[in-house]
UniProtKB/Swiss-Prot annotation:
InterPro entries: Ribosomal_protein_uL29 (IPR050063), Ribosomal_uL29 (IPR001854), Ribosomal_uL29_CS (IPR018254), Ribosomal_uL29_sf (IPR036049). Coiled coil: none annotated. This is Large ribosomal subunit protein uL29c. It comes from the Eukaryota. Keywords: Chloroplast, Plastid, Ribonucleoprotein, Ribosomal protein. Signal peptide: none annotated. Belongs to the universal ribosomal protein uL29 family. It is found in: Plastid, Chloroplast. One of its GO terms (molecular function) is structural constituent of ribosome.
């Protein structure tokens, strides 16, 4: 699984961008919960989720500064 590209994020509208940020934060929380309770989880999903969240927040902040 490759890391997501920022071009996909740039093409999103503001509402879907906000929804995606919330979904990724929830996914990271679930991964941390699984790790803490020693359930099966895929550790590489931490990297992918954090990378995606950083992309989303970067685009959101740049749009807020340009407006």
């Amino acid at each position: 699984m490759t890391l997501p590209k920022i071009l996909d994020v740039i093409q999103m509208d503001d509402s879907s961008l906000s929804e995606e940020i919330i979904a990724i934060k929830r996914q990271l929380f679930d991964l941390r919960l699984k790790r803490a309770t020693r359930q099966d989880f895929k550790p590489h999903l931490f990297k992918h989720s954090k990378h995606r969240l950083a992309q989303l927040l970067t685009v959101e902040k740049s749009r807020a500064q340009s407006n």
